[in-house]
UniProtKB/Swiss-Prot annotation:
Pfam families: Ldh_1_C, Ldh_1_N. It is an enzyme of class 1 (oxidoreductase). The modification Phosphotyrosine is found at residue 221. The active site is at 175 (proton acceptor). This is L-lactate dehydrogenase. Its main location: cytoplasm. Homotetramer. The keyword tRNA processing does not apply. Its EC number is 1.1.1.27. NAD(+) binds at residues 11, 32, 37, 62, 76-77, 115-117, 143. Allosterically activated by fructose 1,6-bisphosphate (FBP).
Amino acid sequence: MKIGIVGCGFVGATAAYAMVMRGVGRKLVMVDVNRARARAEAADISHAVPFAHALEVIAGEYEELEGASVVLVAAGVGQKPGETRLQLLERNAAIFKEVIPQVLRHAGDAVLLVASNPVDVLTHLAASIAGELGIPSSRVVGSGTTLDTARFRSLLSSSLGIDPRHVHAYVLGEHGDSEVLGWSTVTVGGMPLDAFAHRKGASFPPGLIASIDHQVRHAAYEIISGKQATYYGIGSALANIVEVMVYDRRSILTVCTPLPEVEGVENVTIALPHLVGGRGVLETFPPALDHMEREALRNSARIVRNAIESINV
């Protein structure tokens, strides 16, 4: 199976490397406006193939995306220290208006996976462009809060001393400052968080809850402050999403895709738990949040909707 990657910066290249390590697909086609960068990244990653899985990794043009089942779009400028994801919008929206039509011209049957930030708004923009070509919005998916959700689960598991794969917790809304940690819906081993913590002799006092919230919400800023970019975590998250799509795993992931309504906010793209498979988003499962979380999710949806309107989508 062919997978396209458009944008060979830190995120796109790291996602490609993660796919090789996981053995996702059979062929990776890397496309970038900087052709020398695409060739160099493809060559470097291909040298890891003998130590991992037998994938063909090449640099190419948009034409070579034809027949791809998934195209990862990681094109755009990066987030600067102190810059919010929404502040990136104007610059990256202009890039998307050039890139997305070229991708769809050659890979119109593919699922688009958007990674560029602000991912919620750019996914909405990509879906709008795709819609003009008759492509359903369910086949345009953003990485959403998949990485934030992983951070949340990891911190909870550390506090409980268990494997994070057995913690079911979700971060919802914008992938950014207004995201919502769904504390009221957390379960561990089939039990509500408080009940499981009590059995373990642990607790989540307000101070610990606030600390976890801060760490999840501000992780990217702290990483960017120290090394100018984030890419290992999101690269791994993207490789996982692509694997789910390529092999039709039918996994519940907090990706983002255009939704008709969220908490009274219409026509908005934010992260909720979605059933994801070979043709993109198959179904949406809004969680049963408490009152404060619902208000926070409504606020997050409004923020993203306002950003969408700012680029006239």
